[in-house]
Amino acid sequence: MSDPVQPDSGTADALLRAVEDQQSALVELAGTLIACRTDSQSEDNPEFPSEAQRCQQIVAAWLSDLGAEVHRWHEPPHYPVVAARLPGSAAGRTLAFNGHVDVVPVGDASAWTHNPWGGEAASGRLWGRGAADMKGGVACALVAMRAIRESGIGLAGDLWAHIVADEEVVGRSTRHLLSRLPAVDAVLVAEPTALSIMPVEGGLVHFRIEIDGRESHAGNRYMSVHAGGLGGHAGVNAIEKMLRVVTALQALERQWGNLRNHPMLPAGFNTIMPGIIAGGPGGGADGKLNIVSNPGTSPNYCSVEYNLWFLPGESFPAIRDEVESLVWAVSQTDPWLREHPPRFTWKLRDIYFPPAETSPEHPFMQSLVAALEKAGQEPRIEAFTAASELAWYAEVGIPGAIFGPGRIAQAHSPDEYVDLDQLHAACSVMALAAAAWCGVASF
């Protein structure tokens, strides 16, 4: 495929005018999406299936009105997916805008001064749950597609919208979408980046370690900790055995931070953080105690759940093997652990994201840089220090970047908002980037 024809100043100006003409529609659409109560993590929100369906119906209707080819289905048990193709002339490169319409719960409603489901525009901001993360970004993508249509520009390559409703629960919609639909040549994930281009993110995995001990009355403890006692026959404290493992993994974390790095990620980003611990007598499994007793019996069960970040260029199997090998080595120095080795559960609750990395020199990155410049914004290329759906595109070899309105600091917080000027700028950049990457077939 030859390089597609790039937009000249005339087509760029036409796109910017078209986006400008859609500003009221942009704010209205984003507010309408915010008004859908799509908090997918809330156990007290039985309305999620119907609200997610309503939200995705708005998305699908918008895209259908553009003349896009719309695909809809549900991921079990109740996550609607909308994928739509704005066809090009088949001579250019293809691009997908990725976004999610599910949000995290409101939390403490008394901490909000704006209605979390109001979608209110006030003081130069759009307020509500999902304004930044990421219904604002979804609205920008949809309005950018309309602006391309309204400008009279015909793209050379197909422009897709991939909109899901299960990102906040680490669902499988995007993964299944990528196996179900034609592959695209690049993706733009519209998460909040405050208009920075973010083509890099680390890998993430959750895992659990479990250790068994032996119960005994606390009055017998002296026999297991002093020379001449009964040792393990007087009880084995699973919490203390776990401390050996926790200490070893903490040392490994420090070693990683000192010896391994990535030029775009903060030093020490690759961490191994213990986040949840459970231990006690009475036994346990899967990170849960069978009973809640008292500390008068030595604990025979302990589990620790970890959040582990690793770097682009590193593989999950290698990281897993390194962690397990270290814990095995520690176990060999302890008679009890040698005979009762720690047990691992990886990808706990399905939490796993592969790393993503697209070179700043990649042509798609250059399309984004050029789009920012044409929109009057200073290009900034940085790393994303959270996990996103970009991971699943990277896993199948699709280059891309995270780019959108809003700040990650606003996400998941009370009085979440997105600046209206960032909404406008992000929409302009998305339209310009699509034209630059897909190419212009006609105008």
Short names for language-model regions:
Residues 1-12, 21, 71-74, 212-443:
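Metal-dependent amide/peptide-bond hydrolase catalytic core
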Residues 132, 136-253, 412-428:
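Fold-level recognition of mixed alpha/beta catalytic cores in primary-metabolism enzymes, strongest
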Residues 106-122, 202-205, 210-213, 217, ...:
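Acidic-glycine-rich active-site phosphate/pyrophosphate-binding loop
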Residues 80, 124-125, 159, 300-304, ...:
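Short amphipathic alpha-helical segments
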Residues 49, 53-57, 138, 320, ...:
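Short, surface-exposed alpha-helical segments at coil->helix boundaries
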Residues 111, 153, 199-203, 295-299, ...:
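Short glycine/proline-enriched loop/turn "hinge" motifs that connect secondary-structure elements
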Residues 3-127, 150, 154-155, 407:
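Acidic/His- and Gly-rich active-site-bordering loop/insert found
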